[in-house]
Amino acid sequence: MESSVQNKPIIELRSITKSYGDKTIIENFNLTINNGEFLTILGPSGCGKTTVLRLLAGLEELDSGNIILDGEDITHVPAEQRHVNTVFQSYALFPHMTIFENVAFGLRMQKVPNEEIKPRVLEALRMVQLEEYAYSKPAQLSGGQQQRIAIARAVVNKPKVLLLDESLSALDYKLRKQMQNELKALQRKLGITFIFVTHDQEEALTMSDRIIVLRKGHIQQDGSPREIYEEPKNLFVAKFIGEINIFNATVLTRVDEKRVRANVEGRVCDIYTNLDVVAEQKLKVLLRPEDILIEELDENQSSKAIIGHVADRNYKGMTLESNITLDHNGMTVLVSEFFNEDDPNIDHSLGQKVALTWHEGWEVVLSDEE
């Protein structure tokens, strides 16, 4: 029974369009969000992600289309009457009020009886582990604590959906990492649908059940973090999510249903793809830095692999990154290897000749969009 409730759509955006003047930001946009889901809308600045959030919150009016919340059409329902709350990047806490009064503010505006307010506020503060700061002022709290207070204020009204607009971007790196874990744990505890807007790919991959990648108001890919990272649907998604190497390939022939023989940066090899291809067709072969295997060669040693030379090395703690310049065309390839101080073969010298390969089937093959 619980599973069916969780899979029930809580929000449906049906063919929504929004323009500012003569500039269309979102056009014929459709999206279904399930109950209890942590969904991230990810994209570069100007892609329309914040516009979608503001439309959901009722802070902007649609030009056309419909917004359905839990089966009810709320397209023309004012923001204050929607069961949706928003946590903004600035947190917007009232500096002259105590933390208790900040969290209680929305309840008082809704004329909730006084005897209900105190237990609800304290429960919300307990959820974010800040009950002991109830009678402090916002200025006495750290940035991370203020962020949690903003969340407590948003959830005390028991919304059906919580919207978060780049709400971790003001925090320093270490605190942001900590808050990513806390926010996801809180979402699981509350069971409320979270819709998080960010341009930070790492945040999206860390916290989300599902990611929507947006570009110029259009969905480029909709999937789990793993699908988005390991199986990008186009070059935009591939380039936007993490580091990736993009090799040029030319089709030679199809070997079987799964494999195509191709020339990949001077190396003839079999690549896995179900694309309908013809001889001489141009393709792109995509590989994450951690998926590439590197082998040192003597300078006069030949190999059927892609050949290059080590141009730079960067120690990253858990990993060692190598920039490899390909002999074939001077292209730079990024290779990431897990650091093992007992492995004598991992710390390659600058100028070292190397062979690059990968495990069959780990590559992503896309049509050449250029």
UniProtKB/Swiss-Prot annotation:
Its main location: membrane. It is a peripheral membrane protein. It catalyses: ATP + H2O + polyamine-[polyamine-binding protein]Side 1 = ADP + phosphate + polyamineSide 2 + [polyamine-binding protein]Side 1. Belongs to the ABC transporter superfamily. Spermidine/putrescine importer (TC 3.A.1.11.1) family. Part of the ABC transporter complex PotABCD involved in spermidine/putrescine import. Responsible for energy coupling to the transport system. Transmembrane segments: none annotated. It is found in: Cell inner membrane. One of its GO terms (molecular function) is ATP binding. This is Spermidine/putrescine import ATP-binding protein PotA. Residues 11-241 form the ABC transporter domain. PANTHER family: SPERMIDINE/PUTRESCINE IMPORT ATP-BINDING PROTEIN POTA (PTHR42781), SPERMIDINE_PUTRESCINE IMPORT ATP-BINDING PROTEIN POTA (PTHR42781:SF4). PROSITE patterns: ABC_TRANSPORTER_1 (PS00211), ABC_TRANSPORTER_2 (PS50893), POTA (PS51305). It comes from the Bacteria. The complex is composed of two ATP-binding proteins (PotA), two transmembrane proteins (PotB and PotC) and a solute-binding protein (PotD). It comes from Pasteurella multocida (strain Pm70). NCBIfam families: potA, PRK09452.1.
